[in-house]
A protein has these predicted regions:
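Active-site-facing alpha/beta catalytic cores
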Residues: 5-10, 77, 90-245, 249-250, ...
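Conserved phosphate/anionic-ligand binding catalytic regions in large, soluble enzymes, centered on
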Residues: 59-72, 331
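Conserved, mostly hydrophobic/aromatic
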Residues: 63, 268, 335
Length: 363
């Protein structure tokens, strides 16, 4: 027995380790076009201007709870782009493009993790599909917003994203706050699943400062990343045990941000805890939010809707071919006609308000 033999200490619970294309290789395989790059940059710059209060419009992050069929999702994107152009003078539309689903327990973790929805976990193909879909959305001319869940994902798809959000289950995580401080987009922090604001406000504060953390370069090499801090983190209110979109909750959040000497920017997620997971309640939430803006609440900068071609949701199937490509497999969504009606209402009310505000400034 050689003196060098040790008991096996590593990878005791690892079945296999498969190499993955580097971010540089993936970007070379699916490169940005000038048109796509312009969409992403315009999206980021517009969101920054809205968050700075220089642009009086409201932004709307609208799209499926999760994407499971790319053809249906592209059809959705084209419909959304047509509508976005019609309402662009008062509402700036970003498509919600979620490929990763944080699960409270277990379940399908999204297109990147298991693109074929059959427990084959072809993650490299999932990343390629995600990157290619984001490229298509950018080519259509829609900025995209997504959830920052896997900490390596920004290296693979971050150049195609205009808005990121850190979800309720990860807003307290040090790793995500560090990445938020270095990410190239405005970034939302959701309140905790229990409704508490502390994690989101501390997340905003943390992301605004510099950090030093470990990551992987475009060539897949470990490196230390040192960040300057992100000037555009904001709180996303998604409800908890009870909703938190009402005027008192929003005023409380604004006060907490002011007390912490942080920018008073709030986005309302009309779904999740604010809708009690009932998709058709999203309209009530949005109307309440618009009423608050009309009453002079200036901290509300945007809202989120979970929307799909068809409403409701469907259970997962052992045979994914049996799934309806146009209906959510995760949270309930509102259908397209409802989405269009709500966005047009938001546009009409914001247009009127912006007109009144500009007239009162002239006088």
């Amino acid at each position: 027995k050689s003196p060098m033999s040790h008991p096996r200490l590593e990878n005791l619970n690892i079945e296999s380790v498969a190499p993955l294309a580097t971010p540089r290789e993936m970007k070379a395989a699916i490169p940005l076009s000038a048109a796509a790059a312009a969409t992403v940059a315009r999206g980021r710059e517009t969101l920054e201007r809205i968050l700075d209060g220089e642009d009086p419009r409201l932004f709307a992050v609208v799209g499926p709870c999760s994407i499971h069929n790319l053809d249906a999702a592209e059809e959705y994107a084209r419909k959304l782009k047509t509508l976005a152009d019609e309402i662009a003078d008062a509402v700036f539309v970003v498509m919600r493009v979620y490929f990763e689903k944080p699960r409270s327990s277990i379940g399908w973790k999204g297109l990147i993790n298991d693109p074929y929805m059959n427990d084959t976990f072809h993650i490299e193909e999932g990343i390629r599909m995600a990157r290619h879909f984001l490229f298509r959305v950018a080519e259509i001319g829609l900025p995209a917003g997504t959830e920052l869940l896997d900490v390596l994902m920004p290296q693979y798809i971050g150049d195609l994203v205009s808005w990121n959000v850190i979800g309720a289950r990860t807003a307290e995580a040090q790793t995500h706050r560090e990445i938020a401080s270095g990410i190239s987009t405005p970034i939302g922090f959701k309140n905790g699943t229990d409704g508490s604001l502390g994690a989101a406000i501390n997340g905003v504060r943390s992301a605004m400062g510099p950090h030093h953390f470990l990551g992987v370069t475009e060539d897949g090499l470990p490196a230390v990343f040192s960040t300057t801090g992100n000037a555009y983190p904001h709180v996303v209110l998604r409800g908890g045990k009870t909703p938190n979109y009402d005027a008192d909750s929003i005023a409380g959040c604004v006060d907490a941000l002011r007390d912490a000497h942080l920018p008073q920017n709030v986005v309302v997620d009309c779904s999740h805890g604010n809708s009690g997971k009932k998709a058709d309640r999203q309209g009530l939430v949005l109307r309440d939010v618009l009423t608050q803006i009309e009453a002079g609440q200036t901290a509300i900068r945007g809202f989120m809707l979970e929307s799909n071609l068809e409403g409701g949701n469907q259970p997962m199937q052992a045979n994914p071919a049996l799934l309806n490509p146009r209906c959510s497999v995760t949270d309930e969504c509102i259908d397209w006609p409802t989405t269009e009606a709500l966005l047009r209402e938001a546009h009409a009310r914001m247009s009127k308000l912006m007109r009144q505000n500009s007239e009162s400034r002239i006088q």
